[in-house]
Amino acid sequence: MGKINFVFYSMIFLASTVMAGKPTAEEENLYNECDKGNGKYSSCTKLIKILSEKCDSGDMIGCADVGYIMGFELGMREASVAPLDKSCKAGIAESCYNLGIFDIMRRGNIERAFSSYVIACERFTDEKKLLKLKSCELREALDGCLRDNKDRDPVKCARKAYGKIYQEYHENENSTKE
C-alpha cells in the first residue's frame, strides 16, 4: 500500500502543473495567501467561494480550478469530485485526468475513471503530449481491467496499471533530464 500512496502523491505533484485557467489577480493573491491550506484559512475559504460561484454560473475552468484546489491542494477530496466531474463532462481534459486519479486510487470507481480517460485522451492537445499519452494508456489499461473482471479485481488491476504507467513515464522523464 505504501508504494501505491507514493505513486498517488507523486501524481498529485505532477498534476499541479496541468491546470490551464488564467486566474484573476484577486484569485492569485488568495491562492498565495492560502498556501495550500498552510496559510490564512479565510483566504482559502474565500478562494473556494469565488471559484465555486464561477462553477455554479457555468464557468467550467472555475469548476476545474475549485475541484483541483479542494482535492489536490487542500485535501478535500470528496468535495472536489463534483466540480471535477462537472468540468470533465464539459470536456476539460485536466479535470478528467485528475478525476481519474481519484477514482482509481481513492474511490475504486473504475468505470468512471475509464470514461474520464477516454475524454482526456481525446481532449489533450499536443501541447500536453505527456498527459495525453498517459491518459490514452490508462484508457486502454482500464478497458482491459473492466473486460477481464472475472479473473481479477478491477480495482486492484487498475491501481497496478496506474502505478506501472506512472513509473514508466516517471523513469522516462528522469532519463531525459540526465
Language model regions located:
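Short helix-capping/linker turns of helical repeat alpha-solenoids
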Residues: 37-40, 58-60, 73, 90-93, ...
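N-terminal leader/linker segments that initiate helical-solenoid repeat arrays
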Residues: 18-49
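TPR/TPR-like (Sel1-like) alpha-helical repeat modules
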Residues: 111-126, 159-166
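Terminal, low-structured helical/coil segments at or just beyond the last alpha-helical repeat
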Residues: 130-178
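Structural signature of tandem alpha-helical TPR/SEL1-like repeats
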Residues: 41-46, 72-83, 108-116
